[in-house]
C-alpha cells in the first residue's frame, strides 16, 4: 500500500472549503485563487537541483486545486528567479492558471520574495485562498507561514440568503495536525484493503501537473495535462 503525504489537503481550512463545495453551499465554482506570500526555508540538498518553488511549494497548491475541483484540462505557468535565493534556480516566483472544462479558472501566485521582508522592510506574509461560486463565496487564510507556524487556519463563507459571513474556528493547525489525516488515510487503507485517499495513482496526476507547469514555463505556452499524464 502506497499513500502520499499531500498534507495541505488535510489543513482544516482546505477541508472546510471542500465541504462547502461538496454540499453545494456556494454552488458551481467559477473562480478560485491561492495567493502565497511566504519565505520558505530551502534545504541544502535543493541547491544542486536547479529548481525550487514548483516542486516544493506549488505542488501543494496544485494538489489542493485538484482536491477541490478535480483535474484541469491544461495549465499555463510563468516563473522568474527569486532575488533572495542565491543558488541557481529557475522557478523562484511562480504564477499559473489551471483551466477546467467547466469554465472554472484556478489561479495561484507563489511569491517567495514577498518584498524585502528579510532585508529591512516590514513583512506582509501569508497564504490566502478564495473560491467564488454561483451561490456563494468562501475565503480562507492558511496558518502555516504565520508566527508561530502552529497558528490555526481560518475560513469565512456566505451564500445567497445569508445576512452575514460565517467564520467557524478551531484550535488545530496544519502543522502538526494535518499529518494525522495523511497517516490515518494510510492506516485505513491497510485495515480495509482499499486504495488510500491519496494513493500513488492519484498523486501521479499532481506530479504530472507540476511537470506540465515546468514545460509551460519553458516553452511559454499552455500545456495539456494529457501531454504529460497518458
Language-model features and meaning:
Residues 3, 8-88, 94-97, 220:
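Predominantly a Rossmann-like dinucleotide-binding segment in NAD(P)-dependent oxidoreductases
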Residues 4, 29, 75, 108, ...:
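Short, hydrophobic secondary-structure boundary micro-motifs
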Residues 44-48, 120, 169-170:
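Short acidic, glycine/proline-rich loop/turn micro-motifs
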Residues 56, 60-147, 180-193, 228-230:
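Contiguous beta-strand/loop segments that form the cofactor/metal-binding neighborhood of enzyme cores
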Residues 107-110, 138-142, 158, 162-174:
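Short amphipathic beta-strand/extended segments with alternating polar/hydrophobic composition
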Residues 129, 145-163:
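Short polybasic amphipathic segments
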Residues 150, 185-230:
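C-terminal helix-rich "cap/oligomerization" subdomain common to oxidoreductases
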Residues 171-183:
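Active-site loop of classical SDR/Rossmann-like NAD(P)-dependent oxidoreductases
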